[in-house]
Swiss-Prot record:
The keyword Lipoprotein does not apply. FAD binds at D28, Q36, Y41, A81, F115, D274, S315. This is Ferredoxin--NADP reductase. It comes from Frankia alni (strain DSM 45986 / CECT 9034 / ACN14a). The keyword Cell membrane does not apply. GO terms for molecular function: ferredoxin-NADP+ reductase activity; flavin adenine dinucleotide binding; NADP binding. Its EC number is 1.18.1.2. Gene3D superfamilies: FAD/NAD(P)-binding domain. It catalyses: 2 reduced [2Fe-2S]-[ferredoxin] + NADP(+) + H(+) = 2 oxidized [2Fe-2S]-[ferredoxin] + NADPH. Binds 1 FAD per subunit. Its cofactor is FAD. Keywords: FAD, Flavoprotein, NADP, Oxidoreductase. It holds the Pfam family Pyr_redox_2.
Length: 321
């Protein structure tokens, strides 16, 4: 089995395919396993993964890599899945580096594809000098005044994570309605994070590093300057599925349409996780785990016609086949 995408769903899929007795390779365009969690949110605390009241992104990825390692999957990192070709009893995927992988079945767990942070309209000259789009390490913000820009889950999660470490945290949003999870909003409102609505960053000042930030009140036009050493722009990102759009897949709202078995309609190609779309779809890490298990189980008879879809329940050291 070839799994395209080494994020949380892909890593769990590698474990589960190994559990079903398959050999597995994972291909990902990023240089490290973990997908968006590793690349953008390694320090963010995740609260909605079963069995973990709270776990940092990096720790979750480490646990998934360890879990998959017992079946020794092959990692093909820093290369994008580019071309798909069919053989009578297999598919061949060619990577952007020319690496050809022949597999009985492919499971696409590519998240949202290649993702690029939406830039802050002003202050891009300070990128890497106090302006960041994600927080790789929390401790570097100790005793700093931090401005977090945005109104979604990432903005609120970063504000909450930085609150006990930074000297001050200010959350700036251009509206008074937020897209973040209601429970997270309540936690931020109950913290010492200052929330400024109807506000935007007008300018960022400083020589080598950020020294102060100029904010504008969008309804009145009033401006004020406050000290800051860091700005976290959590404005979301744009996603691009790249070559996958040329694989003959049925697309639905920039996602891959699948049926209840996670089958894409393209022979020997399944998909799971955030990249998929079906009625009632909810994009969570937790649902991605269930979807990739469904995909692997339904792919098992494609790999081996003698295999059953339902593997039975795991216990002890037994392995399903």
């Amino acid at each position: 089995m070839l799994i395209v995408g080494a994020g949380p769903a892909g890593l769990y899929g590698a474990y589960y395919a190994g559990f079903r007795g398959m050999s597995v390779a994972l291909m990902d365009s990023l240089p490290e396993a973990g997908g968006q969690v590793t690349a953008m949110y390694p320090e963010k605390v995740i609260y909605d993964v079963a069995g973990f009241p709270a776990i940092r992104g990096r720790e979750l990825v480490d646990a998934l890599v360890t879990q998959a390692a017992q079946f020794d999957p092959t990692y093909l990192l820093d290369q994008q899945a580019a071309e798909l070709a069919h053989e009578p009893d297999a598919v061949v995927v060619t990577s952007s580096q020319g690496h050809r992988v022949r597999a009985r079945v492919v499971v696409i767990t590519g998240g949202l594809g290649t993702f690029t942070p939406r830039p802050l309209p002003t202050g891009t000259g300070h990128l890497g000098r106090g302006l960041v789009y994600f927080v790789p390490k929390l401790d570097v913000y100790a005793d700093q005044d931090v401005i977090v820009v945005g109104g979604g889950d990432s903005a609120f999660d970063w504000a909450l994570a930085l609150e006990p470490i930074a000297r001050s945290v200010t959350l700036v949003h251009r509206r008074d309605r937020f897209r973040a999870h209601a429970a997270t909003i309540e936690r931020v409102e109950a913290s010492r994070v200052e929330i400024l609505t109807f506000s935007e960053v007008a300018a960022i000042h400083g020589e080598d590093r950020i020294e102060k930030v100029e904010l504008v009140q969008t309804r009145t036009g009033d401006r004020h300057v406050r000290p800051a050493q860091a700005v976290v722009a959590a404005l979301g990102f744009t996603a691009d599925l790249g070559p996958l759009t040329r694989w003959g897949l049925t697309m639905a709202r920039r996602h891959i349409a699948v049926d209840s078995t996670m089958f894409t309609g393209v022979d020997r190609v399944f998909a799971a996780g955030d990249i998929t779309e079906y009625p009632g779809k909810v994009r969570l890490i937790a649902t991605g785990f269930g979807e990739v298990a469904t995909a692997v189980n339904n792919a098992a008879p494609v790999v081996d016609p003698a295999a059953k879809v339902f593997p039975g329940h795991s216990s002890g050291d037994s392995t399903a086949s």
